[in-house]
Amino acid sequence: MGFLSKIMGAGAPTPSVPKAARFRTEPDAIYVPVSVLLVPLDKVNDKTISQGIFGAGAAILPMGDVVFAPADGRVEVTMVTNHAIGIRTADGADVLVHVGIDTVKMDGKGFERFVEAGENVFAGQPLLAFDADRIVEAGFDPTVIVSVTNSDERAVALVAESGTKIDGMPLLKVGEPLLRVG
């Protein structure tokens, strides 16, 4: 965008989409979408999430600012506030990636989405970026929730509890297996 366009307010800046992460994909696996510390879902400070209303899954404390697709699939739902995305995998698992607790109240500030509903995505493709500092400054928790919302129809097992730990919580890297869906 040129100098005059900036002054005149013409056009919106084009978002800079991060490079895709490389995931070694396996069938029936949901992968870590952002480098994280794993937290038991029942320890999340939100009744809806901690009681499993969004389905079986994991709560993760983000150590990055880009959320990558945790599985191959089709984007079924995006939020106008850009804080959550729903993906249906080829085998029918409905995966919700939800950034932050009550961050819907931020009205999209601090979030940038790179995909739209109806798009096919691959594991490792950038879905959205977020500003964790801005989330905290706004008084919210930046915990990322990854859940299988139709877990009442299929088995979901947490597989990412081994490895390096910080304060007793597993340290996970983008692309490592997080959940198995059967």
What is each model feature region?
Residues G2-G182:
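Contiguous, well-folded functional domains in the mature portion of proteins
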